[in-house]
A protein has these predicted regions:
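Structural motif
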Residues: 17-20, 99, 126, 152-156
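Surface-exposed amphipathic alpha-helical segments
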Residues: 25, 131-168
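Short amphipathic
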Residues: 8-11
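Conserved polar/disulfide-associated segments of primarily extracytoplasmic proteins
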Residues: 1-6, 27-133, 138-146
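Proline-anchored loop/turn motifs at beta-strand termini and strand-loop-strand connectors
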Residues: 14-32, 161
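Soluble non-cytosolic domains of exported or imported proteins
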Residues: 16, 62-66, 147, 151-155
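A general, composition-driven signal for non-globular sequence regions
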Residues: 19, 49, 84-85, 156-158
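Extracytoplasmic/secreted envelope proteins and their assembly/folding machinery
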Residues: 22, 34, 69, 73, ...
């Protein structure tokens, strides 16, 4: 990751959202993803957005911040590549977006997998019966994810997550 990452705004009027992403990254097409941004110099670093219609009007109808976080970690722990006992919720918080006042749940967790250790960042919100999910992930550069490069990745993904909002 570059020392100072320049961000570019991406607006998807069809799916009703916007976010900022690293300018050098490439927008790719992938089944199941509304938008997928990949770092051309780091193979498994990505930021994906999924937009899905739902029958609920708010995240609270699906569960509390903690309930959904627990379900998320449980689902990750059941994946074949996740080492038993290898899921760790690092942070979970709730925020209201600036433009539309949409409630977002934010999760950061660590996975120990058979392919290496990975950090995952999820930003989840519901507005107008539509579920919006931003999923950003990268493998740790150093065991424990505490290297300077890992810190920069963490700061970048948090900035991208904070930039995400539903269009008015």
């Amino acid at each position: 990751f570059a020392d100072e990452m320049t961000l570019t705004e991406y607006v998807d009027e069809t799916n009703n959202f916007h976010l900022s992403y690293p300018t050098e990254w490439v927008l790719e097409k992938k089944a199941g993803a509304t938008a997928l941004f990949k770092n051309p110099s780091v193979k498994y670093a990505s930021i994906g957005v999924t937009v899905t219609p739902v029958r609920i009007d708010s995240l609270k109808e699906f569960g509390s911040l903690e309930d959904i976080g627990a379900k998320l970690v449980e689902a990750e722990s059941k994946k074949q590549t996740t080492v038993p006992g290898g899921t760790f919720m690092e942070r979970q918080s709730e925020r209201e977006s600036v433009d539309t006042k949409t409630t977002f749940y934010e999760y950061e967790y660590r996975l120990i997998t058979t392919h290496g250790n990975k950090r995952v960042y999820n930003y989840v919100g519901v507005r107008d019966r539509t579920l919006f999910i931003v999923n950003a992930q990268a493998y740790e550069i150093e065991e424990g994810g505490e290297s300077e490069a890992d810190e920069k990745t963490r700061a970048l993904y948090r900035e991208v997550g904070r930039s995400f909002d539903v269009l008015k």
